[in-house]
Amino acid sequence: MKRLKKAALAVACAAVLCSVFSGCGGDKKDTAKAAPAEEKVLTVYTARSESLNNLVIPAFEKETGIKVNVIVAGTGPLVKRVASEKDNPQGDILWAADQTMLDSQKELFEKYVSPEDANMIDAAKNKTGYFSPAFADPTVFIVNKKLAGDMKIAGFDNLLNPALKGKIACGDPANSSSAFQVLMAMLYAKGKDGDPMSPEAWAYVDNFIKNVDGKFLNSSGAVHKGAADGEYTVGLTWEDPAATYVKNGADVEVVFPKEGAIFPGESVQIIKGAKHMENAKKFIDFMLSQKIQEAAGKTLTVRPLRKGVKLADYMTPQDTIALFKNYDEGWVAAHKKEVVAEWNKHLENSRQ
């Protein structure tokens, strides 16, 4: 009996010791502090259109319960803001620009490739790890059908038609991002063996400058408006405003050049050191999702970049558009200054 009492006492003492010291199994879980949950907010810097912001952001808030603080400004000011705040980031997402503009400033962004990236068209994959193309502003011609009549305007060769001399609206690639994309499309279309810097590519540019009559517009908006209003027969622009005219019943046609189009992806990226990292990842996943990509394709005039998305009837079907297979956005980003300098040289020579 005494032995049993001693054994019971030993067990009781051991139990007390276990409750005092952390050496017994299972206590580490109880004493470890749980990581604080990320607050359900997200700050988005966006240069996108009001219609696109209104499509994406309220839907994201509703689906996730995450409150989005929206800061709207132009692309340039937003990129400068991200750079100025790099030591103490105030934003989580930059929804502006594309790889061409941002590639030299990768250090301002976090690497993140969404699981949805696998569902995007090949030309819109996140190849760098930083920039997720969501929608595109492809290079197009907006043709005034009344002025064009029976004239064929299907590709870059047609733009050298003497009947179009002085009747082509185009911005200055040195001052307009959309005009720069038009220039790159020309160079890839007419370059020997697809080399955008070949003499053949720039010979085409010289002839184009002559047919434009050396007059390049200062406003990108004046390009598509000039064609729609009948001031010019054709304008070299981007799809969103051109498709808007078609949607609204204007007597214009959107033409994707037969040689190929450039699909600069309006990308979305996470700001380096974002305070709401997991929420930012959810935002990118949501933007690339079937739900949002298809909603944009059916109701807006921006081009979604997810495979198999249905489009409104005023949009050009994806399978009828030729894309440059050798277009290298990384190369363009690295050589933009060189291309613009060459453009300026050819433009200056045309005026002598």
Feature locations, PLM:
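Periplasmic-binding protein-like
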Residues: 123, 137, 204-209, 216, ...
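Extracellular/periplasmic bilobal clamshell ligand-binding domains
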Residues: 313-352
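Short beta-strand->loop
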Residues: 110-118, 130-132, 157-160, 250-262, ...
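Mature extracytoplasmic/periplasmic domains
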Residues: 261, 266, 271-327
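A ligand-binding cleft/hinge motif common to bilobed small-molecule-binding domains
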Residues: 100-105, 228, 233-251
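Extracytoplasmic ligand-binding site segments that recognize negatively charged/polar headgroups
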Residues: 46-53, 73-77, 83, 89-231
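Short, polar/charged alpha-helical segment
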Residues: 42-67
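Short, low-complexity disordered leader/linker segments with a strong preference
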Residues: 1-41, 350-352
